[in-house]
């Protein structure tokens, strides 16, 4: 976990969506001067980041992420940290029993991520990014959101229909994430993009394996790896044996 004290200020802030309850903004952190923005002639991706906080709290500019933003920009990446609506704000403890509430919160965040993505795609020249070179990343609730977003795209759901036809992200980075499925398991109709997962095996907030009630399941990194292996998908998984949810802040 990088030092939170490493101060870094955004190079730009844009409003990317207006909702009934709030306006949504994104902070853009450009690659540091003199940093390497390409590898062997290939441009490094733009990285969208979604903060954590259990869909109850959290902000795009929480100083605990400053160290990671600085490290990424010093390594030649453009980072875009986005707002999303907190669908569980004001809720009491939400577990699998209140799954409809959780489902709504996750998809609200996914909807906001897709709006941010469309804003970047519509202004690709300004962001100096190719449409096929955007990576999504997140911590905790943000990690759930990015994993769920790719699940929606790979399965061609109505949620993903707001994106340009044929669009997909270049990759997903999940710090203690999971996927919510009503199908009893996680299947992909189309091949998902390359996925990096980090998860503590003793995580009690976002399950490392799964929580399942009938066909409804919340599938963490440990369980998802089994599916990724089975289908020969492109993934990298870092298991942190004995660690809990602190891995959500390990970037």
Indicate residue ranges for each PLM-predicted region.
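Primarily recognizes the serine-hydrolase "nucleophile elbow" in alpha/beta-hydrolase
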Residues: 118-191
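Serine-hydrolase catalytic-loop signature spanning alpha/beta hydrolases and amidase-signature enzymes
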Residues: 54-57, 79, 119
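N-terminal cap/lid segment of alpha/beta-hydrolase-fold proteins
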Residues: 6-42
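Short amphipathic alpha-helix adjacent to the substrate-entry channel of hydrolases
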Residues: 60-82, 89
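C-terminal catalytic histidine-bearing segment of alpha/beta-hydrolase fold enzymes
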Residues: 229-251
